[in-house]
Amino acid sequence: MTYEWAREKALKVARSILEGDVGIIEGARLLSSFGHELVPDWTLDPDFVVLGALDSETDHLPVGAERKLWEEKALAERDAIVSRIEAEAKEEVESACRNILRRFAGA
């Protein structure tokens, strides 16, 4: 993965989250995977810390394409948890997305 590739993907995902096309958890997972390429130390970067923390806290929950692998009853139980966590994290993740767009759009 190159810096430029990661930058372009991060910008696309950040926009998709803000436009509501990608869920908060799914988007945070994607964005957190680019942090190591975009910043010197993602664990010290306030935007990527938010994204990485949410990724870590929710790595047991099915989002995106992974949902197709889950049994319907188990999925329904997890959906309530996903909805609650996404509602709680929405403002902070969207702020990180706006910061990422501002920081990397002109880079």
Language-model-detected regions and their locations in the chain:
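Acidic, Ser/Pro/Thr-rich low-complexity regulatory regions
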Residues: 1-107
